[in-house]
C-alpha cells in the first residue's frame, strides 16, 4: 500500500473524479484545472489513508464497491456519448428556426400580412413604426435576464443595438463550446463577429480549463471598456497640459477579455486563487446563460415572458422551502414546550429578578460595546 501511495498518478483517480465533477455539476459552475488537480491529489491521499485504516475484510468489501463504481462510470460514459449525439441531432433541427428568426429580427423578410393591417390613427406615436425587423431585439432580451443585466452598462447599449444575432456551437479539439456575436457595421469597433470560446477539461461536466475572447478592434476614442480621466495641472506647474489617465471600467464587452490562469501557478497564494476561480466561475455563468437561456428562448426574454416563468419557478421553490421551515419550527416549538414543562416541574418557583444578561459572543468582554462586522466599501 505504501508503494502505491508514493507512485500515485492522476490517472489512478478515475474512481474519485466522477464524484468531484458531480459536485461541480450540481452547481453548474466551472473550476480551475490546477485547483482540481490539487483536490484530486488530496482525495487520493485520503483514499489511501482510509483503506489502510480498514481491516482486511472491510477493505476487500470496499474494493468490490469500487469495482461496482467503475461499472457505473462506464455506463455513465455511454450516457454522455448518447446525450451529445442527441443534442447534436436536435441542434440541426433548431437551425432552420434560428435562420427564420434572424431574417425577421433583421428585416430581411417580412412576416406574412405584416403590412396588411390598416394604419392606426395613433401610428405616429410609435417610434418603431417605420423600423425594419425588431429593433434592439438582442439588447432587450439580454437586459431582461438578471445575470446579463448586471453586466450591461448604459454606455454599452448604443453598441449592443448593432447586435444582429448570437449563435453557439460545440467544438471538438479541444472540447468545449463557442459563442459568436454578429454585429452590423457600427461606429464603435471594426469586428463583424466577436467570439468567446470555452475550453473544457471534460465536455460532459462544467470543468473549465480556460476561456478565450476575440480582441476587439476599437475605433479611436470608442473603447467602452476604458475611461479616460483628465486632471488639471497644479497652479504654477510648468506643464500646462492636463494629465490624462486611462482606467478600466465596467462593461459588457469585458466578457471578451476573460480572466486567465497564469502559466506558472506555483506563486499564486490561496486568496488569489480563490479570487481567480470566482472570476472564472462568474464568466462561465454568463456564457452558459447566453447559451442555454438567451439563444434558445430569445423572444421570451424580449417580451419578458421568460422572467415570469423563472419567477414562478422560484416561487414554487420558495413555497417548498417555507413548508419545510414551518415544519422544522413546529417541531422545535414542541420540543421547547416539553423542556419548559419539565424545568417548571423540577425548579422551585421564584420571583422574577429582571431580564437575564446574555453572555457576549465568543466569551469576549464588553461584547455589547463591540460594533457589528461590516464590509469595507
UniProtKB/Swiss-Prot annotation:
Name used for this protein in its record: Nucleosome assembly protein 1;1
**Can you list the GO cellular component terms from the UniProt entry?**
cytoplasm; nucleus
Tissue localization of expression is: Highly expressed in tissues exhibiting active cell-division activities, such as root and shoot meristems and young flowers.
List residues with covalent lipid attachment of type S-farnesyl cysteine: 374
Compositionally skewed regions (Low complexity) per UniProt: 355-377
The cellular location(s) given in this protein's UniProt record come to:
Nucleus; Cytoplasm
Cysteine methyl ester modification, residue list: 374
Task: Cite the entry's keywords alphabetically.
Answer: Chaperone, Coiled coil, Cytoplasm, Lipoprotein, Methylation, Nucleus, Prenylation
* Keyword Cytoplasm belongs to the record: yes
Segments carrying the region annotation (Disordered) are 306-377
Task: Please state which protein family the record places this protein in.
Answer: Belongs to the nucleosome assembly protein (NAP) family.
Q: What is known of its domains?
A: The acidic domain is probably involved in the interaction with histones.
What the entry lists under SUPFAM superfamilies is as follows: NAP-like
Ranges of Acidic residues composition bias in the record: 308-343
Amino acid at each position: 500500500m505504501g508503494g502505491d501511495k508514493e507512485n500515485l498518478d492522476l490517472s489512478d483517480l478515475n474512481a474519485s473524479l466522477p464524484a468531484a465533477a458531480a459536485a461541480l455539476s450540481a452547481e453548474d459552475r466551472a473550476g480551475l484545472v490546477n485547483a482540481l488537480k490539487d483536490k484530486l491529489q488530496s482525495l487520493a491521499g485520503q483514499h489511501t489513508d482510509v483503506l489502510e485504516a480498514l481491516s482486511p475484510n472491510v477493505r476487500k468489501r470496499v474494493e468490490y464497491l469500487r469495482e461496482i463504481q467503475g461499472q457505473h462510470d462506464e455506463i455513465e460514459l455511454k450516457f454522455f456519448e448518447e446525450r451529445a449525439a442527441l443534442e447534436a441531432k436536435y441542434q440541426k433541427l433548431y437551425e432552420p428556426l434560428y435562420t427564420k428568426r434572424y431574417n425577421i429580427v433583421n428585416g430581411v423578410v417580412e412576416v406574412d400580412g405584416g403590412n396588411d393591417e390598416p394604419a392606426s390613427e395613433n401610428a405616429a406615436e410609435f417610434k418603431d413604426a417605420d423600423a425594419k425587423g425588431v429593433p434592439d431585439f438582442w439588447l432587450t432580451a439580454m437586459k431582461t435576464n438578471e445575470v446579463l443585466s448586471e453586466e450591461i452598462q448604459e454606455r454599452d447599449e448604443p453598441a449592443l443595438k448593432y447586435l444582429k444575432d448570437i449563435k453557439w456551437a460545440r467544438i471538438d479539439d479541444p472540447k468545449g463550446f463557442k459563442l459568436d456575436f454578429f454585429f452590423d457595421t457600427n461606429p464603435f469597433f471594426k469586428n463583424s463577429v466577436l467570439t468567446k470560446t470555452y475550453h473544457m477539461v471534460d465536455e460532459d461536466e462544467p470543468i473549465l480549463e480556460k476561456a478565450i475572447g476575440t480582441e476587439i478592434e476599437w475605433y479611436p476614442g470608442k473603447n467602452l471598456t476604458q475611461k479616460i480621466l483628465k486632471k488639471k495641472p497644479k497652479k504654477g506647474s510648468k506643464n500646462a497640459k492636463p494629465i490624462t489617465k486611462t482606467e478600466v471600467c465596467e462593461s459588457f464587452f469585458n466578457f471578451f477579455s476573460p480572466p486567465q490562469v497564469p502559466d506558472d501557478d506555483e506563486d499564486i497564494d490561496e486568496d488569489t486563487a480563490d479570487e481567480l476561480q470566482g472570476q472564472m466561475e462568474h464568466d462561465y455563468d454568463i456564457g452558459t446563460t447566453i447559451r442555454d437561456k438567451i439563444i434558445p428562448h430569445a423572444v421570451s426574454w424580449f417580451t419578458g415572458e421568460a422572467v415570469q416563468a423563472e419567477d414562478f419557478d422560484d416561487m414554487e421553490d420558495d413555497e417548498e422551502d417555507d413548508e419545510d421551515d414551518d415544519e422544522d419550527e413546529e417541531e422545535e416549538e414542541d420540543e421547547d414546550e416539553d423542556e419548559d414543562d419539565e424545568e417548571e416541574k423540577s425548579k422551585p418557583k421564584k420571583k422574577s429578578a429582571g431580564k437575564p444578561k446574555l453572555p457576549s459572543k465568543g466569551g469576549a468582554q464588553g461584547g455589547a460595546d463591540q460594533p457589528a462586522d461590516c464590509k469595507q466599501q
